[in-house]
Amino acid sequence: MLIPLARAVLALELLGAGAAHAERLKDLASIQGVRGNQLIGYGLVVGLDGSGDQVRQTLFTQQSLTNMLSQLGITVPQGSNMQLKNVAAVMVTATLPSFARPGQTVDVVVSSMGNAKSLRGGTLLMTPLKGADNQVYVIAQGNLLVGGAGASAGGSSVQINQLNGGRISNGAIVERAVPTMYAQDGMVYLEMNNTDFGTTQNAATAINRQFGAGTAMALDGRVIQVRGPLDPSMMPAFMSQVENLQVARAPATAKVIINARTGSVVMNRTVMIEEAAVAHGNLSVIINRQNQVFQPDTPFTEGQTVVVPNTQIEVRQDGGALQRVTTSANLADVVKALNALGATPQDLLAILQAMKTAGALRADLEII
């Protein structure tokens, strides 16, 4: 029986069929110092169709609106209770990309922090976004795009996706640039995305082959030191050539990832299993609850109608037959061997752990 796990693993094998081929260095590593910066701000969304915060329960929304109106020259009488339904307090986040200059735009994500029912159709008012140094780097404003939809009537409601979060494409303008220092005295450091001595050494070898011996040196299993031109104006062209070099990826470490919460099992193509015998019995618990109604036999008496729950619990354990798993070095063969057990992905969690303990699973087992 081909279980859904098998289809997923076979698809991953087909997608990774070319894993042994060369890849661009820019897909395997990043330049040290070239990074984005997280920004955050607090703002107000207006124009909601009665789906905003209930100001009696979210006092910060009313306070924020009063402060904003005061800055615009509008005085709100002290102690007044504004009954507003079209305003919502939100948190706004964005990522300032490297080398961003004033005047450029970035996307922002808007999330409700009160009890608003929906942000659909709202407009974010001018909101400054600050970095970790408490300096303002971008100003966000614009109409929200909310991917969800919902409707309610007569006590019933239907909702598709999330309504309390939205996005504004190019909704923030950069006001301050972040200096990006990635080269000092012509020295650049490349950081591999994954720690692997083989792939790191292959990358250093490819750079030396292109630009001459001594240009690159692997410092450890993740960082490569590259000697570039001393002239800063020549560094962008040099790094462009470095990023587009073809590097052979070393075979990955055999690994099986298990998500105990969802029952997902993912393995790479280097996983091997040794010959073993596996028996796994299925334990099932069935709970059946029915409400029985008892009424008085004769009408017009003092008896009352009583509802009595009747609960039945049944525990069933099916005997597991001993199955032989043959030695397999190919991912497709591993999938076939596991399918022969007739186990569901949830059962495979226990089976793979037992095979690892018995030494039959030649892979690192990681539970997330």
From Swiss-Prot:
Q: What is its main location?
A: periplasm
- CC per GO annotation: bacterial-type flagellum basal body, distal rod, P ring; outer membrane-bounded periplasmic space
List the PANTHER family hit by this protein, alphabetically. FLAGELLAR P-RING PERIPLASMIC PROTEIN FLGI (PTHR30381), FLAGELLAR P-RING PROTEIN (PTHR30381:SF0)
From the UniProt record, which GO molecular function terms apply? Answer: structural molecule activity
Q: What is this protein called?
A: Flagellar P-ring protein
Q: Which UniProt keywords apply?
A: Bacterial flagellum, Periplasm, Signal
Record InterPro entries:
Flag_FlgI
For this chain, the family text in UniProt reads:
Belongs to the FlgI family.
Q: Where in the cell is it found?
A: Periplasm; Bacterial flagellum basal body
What is the gene name?
flgI
| Function according to Swiss-Prot or TrEMBL | Assembles around the rod to form the L-ring and probably protects the motor/basal body from shearing forces during rotation.
Q: What does the annotation say about its assembly with partners?
A: The basal body constitutes a major portion of the flagellar organelle and consists of four rings (L,P,S, and M) mounted on a central rod.
Per the UniProt entry, what are the Gene Ontology biological process annotations, in alphabetical order? bacterial-type flagellum-dependent cell motility
Question: Which organism was this protein described from?
Answer: Bordetella pertussis (strain Tohama I / ATCC BAA-589 / NCTC 13251)
